[in-house]
Every structure is written in C-alpha cells, then in structure tokens.
Amino acid sequence: MMNITDYENIWQSSLIHVTDEFTLPPVVLQAGEAIIGTLGNFSVSTGKAKAKKTFNVSAIVAAALINGKVLEYQASFPESKRTILYFDTEQSPYHCQLVMQRILRLAKLPIDKEPQNLKFSHLRAIADPNERREIIRYAIYHTPNVGLVVIDGIRDLMLDINNSTEATKLVGDLMQWTSEQNIHIQTVLHLNKGDDNARGHIGTELNNKAETMLQIAKDGTQPERSIVAPAIIRSKPFDKFAFRLTETADDICIPELDLSYTDCARKSHHFSYQELSDSEHRKALEQTFASGELLPYGELITALKAAYAEVVGQPYGQTKLKELLRFLLNKRMVIKEDRGKYSFNSDYHY
C-alpha cells in the first residue's frame, strides 16, 4: 500500500519541464519511411477471421530476428534489445511450432536449430486469463535483452472483451510494460464480423492508445491475397501492400510479397470517402493544404479533387466533392475560417 511519500515521489517524477531534453523513442519497426513501432510503445494487427493476421505478424518477427527486411517490414533493434518473446494464446503446440518454423524460414534461418533470440510460448492450455497475463509479465521482466514482444490473441488475457474495467487495466499493463522495460509490444486482435471495428471495449482501448494499428484483409477480388493497410498510424502512412502464401521446398507455408498488386487495384475498392481510413484522409488533406495557407472555396475544391484522386485512384465529381467537404467540416477535419476561407485541423479525431 503506497503512502503519501510514495505519491509525492511519483508526482514529482511525472513532471515534464520546458527545459527537459527529449528525443524520439528509438524507431525499431518501419514500412518504407513510415514508423510502425518504437521502443516504449505498442501496436496492433487487426483483421477478420482467416485474413492471415498471424502470417503478417510472422513477417514482422522475422524482420526483427534478422534486424533486416521481410515483406515491407524493416527492423532495426539495438543490439541490447534483440530478444523476441512470442506468446500465442489460441493455437496448439503443433500449430505454434509451424508458426515458429514459418518465422525462421522467412528469416532464412535453419529450422533444425533453436534460434538464439526467439522464445516462443504457447498459453492455450492455461485456463485463467489472469494467469496468462502474469506469465507474460514475468517473462518480460525476467528475460534479458527483450526488445519485441508479440501477444497473438490479446483478448485471451481477459474474461470479457466488453468489460471496460478489464480493458482499461489490460491496456494499462501494456503501457506500463512498454514504458518500464523500454520494449515494443505487437498485439493481435480480431475485427467485428459486421464492420471494420476492433472487437469489444478492448478494441476501443487499443484503438485509442496504440502507436499503430495495422489492418489485414482479404482482397475483395482475389481472396487468396491479403492486403496490409495502416488503419491508424502516428507517422505518415505507408502505401498498402499485399502478400500471398507460398510453400517452401519443405512444405512450410510462408507469406510472399505480391508485386502485381498496384495502386489502381488497391484504390478502386475505396472510392467512397466514407470508407477511407484516418491515414488516407490525413494524407489527402496534408496534400490539399501543403502550402500551409488558408484556401478559398474554389481553390479548396480543386485541391481536394486532386488530392483525393491520388488516394482513391479516380477523381470525384463536383457533387461528390461538395458532399466530401460537408463531411470534412462536420468531422472538424477542415474548418471554415473568416472571409470564407478554409484551414486544415491537423488535430482532428476521426
């Protein structure tokens, strides 16, 4: 039980001073120039059932294992942060081993030799979600040189995904573990069947607190292909990319970058501005207001047309552009200033 002195110490240590010097947390995961993960933060991979979320996470882990590039993921962990902890809460030991072999194949490492920097734990057999959580906590705090932690199946660390108290406590744990141990945690969570929202209160909390949220989805025209997109990202967004599954000579199924996936194929599925992600809107609006100046109505419509055409792959007509502007104004993404000019509200919440 903490006393007044404890609270005073915590209060004083929490204060930020204008003369303090801070640097950007070390960037450890990127896709192109986009920052996906830094030490001291956590990210989320989301997608509906069978979208191949675990295959995508396998590529992230493989990149971290070699501190190099796999698919579009580039890892750059400090030498003192090269150990990876992978916790799977859903699969049997047999299927967990297949995931481990897939990671090693992606990293071009032998599958008959224990990897030096990867520890893989299966927690399905543990019935109590709180025990699973405490095991993860113990491993994080008692394993040397940890840099990346993967929790594949974070909903299994709580009894009820719609319990707001449980969700807040679990996300609080993620924030505490990443901050105190200076690590990056990548979690995996299903999307709702009926929409593209992360499931339950835990999905809402992760959505609000995560550094990055990746969305993995089956391609609507080619179901054997999965598309990776930045649903939420603090840095500038990366271009969506796609992968297909291929078998190696020893029958291990791995994801392989689909180089035939093009901008036009990608953007045609998101013609409606209401279907665009936060990062896609932000990209278009940053281009629209690239000059940094207030825009009169006519110039704004012209700039919106060009910017959104680049995002969705084809231009909107005048009626659609007027509807788009009304949408942006209602969302406070664009603000109408004095004298009929418009500005970009970069601090909007989508």
Question: Which ranges hold each PLM region?
Answer:
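The Walker A/P-loop phosphate-binding site
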Residues: 2-103, 346-348
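Structured loop/turn residues at beta-strand edges in well-structured enzyme cores
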Residues: 40, 82, 144-145, 181, ...
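Phosphate-binding/switch region of NTP-binding enzymes
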Residues: 44-46, 50, 165-253
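Alpha-helical scaffold elements adjacent to nucleotide-binding pockets in ATP/GTP-utilizing enzyme cores
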Residues: 59-60, 95-103, 135, 170-173, ...
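Conserved inter-motif catalytic segment of the P-loop NTP-binding fold
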Residues: 78-162
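Flexible, glycine- and charge-enriched loops at secondary-structure boundaries
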Residues: 93, 129, 160-167, 200-203, ...
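C-terminal regions of RecA-like/P-loop NTPase motor modules
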Residues: 142, 220-350
